[in-house]
Amino acid sequence: MSYVNRHLIHQINQSARLIAKKANEQLEPFGLYSSQWSVLYCLRTIGPMTQKEIWSYLNVEAPTVTRTIKRLEENGWVQRRQGEDKREKLVVLTKEAEKKYEEINVKMLKFEEELLADFRDEDKEAFSHLFRMFLQQ
């Protein structure tokens, strides 16, 4: 087994933690954490979703998403609405969240650009390709 294979998962995990830490610094002025931003991004990109759809999409355990949504709801970022089925609750962005979203997204896109500035476009494409493959497993 090569050195790369023995340490790749650890390196990915450490990189993800570092990115989350730096993202939290960017999101602090908005009173958000990266885990909360992931939910907001998901809802804005995909649209209203059930909690199950959110945790499935984000590959996060249900209790974690439940707590995150509860905090977002308490802080006015999301609300739960009745779905088509009476038992189904959809999570949606509030009007206030919709207004603030673009400002936050611009900041996060700039953060991403700065974070990846030293990488060649080919490297970024390779990262993207490999992560898509990994997520499809």
From Swiss-Prot:
SMART domains, A to Z: HTH_MARR
DNA-binding region: 51-74
Keywords: DNA-binding, Transcription, Transcription regulation
InterPro entries: HTH_MarR-typ (IPR000835), WH-like_DNA-bd_sf (IPR036388), WH_DNA-bd_sf (IPR036390)
PROSITE patterns with a match to the protein in the record: HTH_MARR_2
Keyword Transcription regulation: yes
Domain HTH marR-type: 5-136
Origin superkingdom: Bacteria
Gene3D superfamilies associated with the record: Winged helix-like DNA-binding domain superfamily/Winged helix DNA-binding domain
GO molecular function: DNA binding; DNA-binding transcription factor activity
SUPFAM superfamilies (UniProt xref): Winged helix' DNA-binding domain
Pfam families, A to Z: MarR
Name of the featured protein: Uncharacterized HTH-type transcriptional regulator YwoH
Native species: Bacillus subtilis (strain 168)
Organism lineage: Bacteria, Bacillati, Bacillota, Bacilli, Bacillales
Gene: ywoH
